[in-house]
Amino acid sequence: MLQSLIKKVWIPMKPYYTQAYQEIWVGTGLMAYIVYKIRSADKRSKALKASSAAPAHGHH
């Protein structure tokens, strides 16, 4: 369903998008990557804090 919709839109628009919007696609990709990295790092730090919280309370 979604793939056929993408093909219907993408194929006629492809030359236009690849030329005119190449920079925008790169920017969008970078933004998505940065957001993903921040979110995964945030999850990791929260997981670390959660796992190190219990022994840390015992020491203080």
From Swiss-Prot:
Subcellular localization(s) per the UniProt record: Mitochondrion membrane
Keywords: Membrane, Mitochondrion, Transmembrane, Transmembrane helix
Coiled-coil intervals: none
Transmembrane segments: 22-39
Subunit organization: Component of the ATP synthase complex composed at least of ATP5F1A/subunit alpha, ATP5F1B/subunit beta, ATP5MC1/subunit c (homooctomer), MT-ATP6/subunit a, MT-ATP8/subunit 8, ATP5ME/subunit e, ATP5MF/subunit f, ATP5MG/subunit g, ATP5MK/subunit k, ATP5MJ/subunit j, ATP5F1C/subunit gamma, ATP5F1D/subunit delta, ATP5F1E/subunit epsilon, ATP5PF/subunit F6, ATP5PB/subunit b, ATP5PD/subunit d, ATP5PO/subunit OSCP.
Top-level taxon in the UniProt lineage: Eukaryota
Alphabetized Pfam families for the sequence: Mit_proteolip
Biological function: Subunit j, of the mitochondrial membrane ATP synthase complex (F(1)F(0) ATP synthase or Complex V) that produces ATP from ADP in the presence of a proton gradient across the membrane which is generated by electron transport complexes of the respiratory chain. ATP synthase complex consist of a soluble F(1) head domain - the catalytic core - and a membrane F(1) domain - the membrane proton channel. These two domains are linked by a central stalk rotating inside the F(1) region and a stationary peripheral stalk.
Protein family (similarity comment): Belongs to the small mitochondrial proteolipid family.
InterPro entries the UniProt entry points to: ATP5MJ
GO cellular component terms attached to this protein's record: mitochondrial membrane; mitochondrion; proton-transporting ATP synthase complex
Keyword Transit peptide: no
Main location: mitochondrion
Name this polypeptide is given: ATP synthase F(0) complex subunit j, mitochondrial
Membrane topology: Single-pass membrane protein
Tissue: Heart, brain and liver mitochondria.
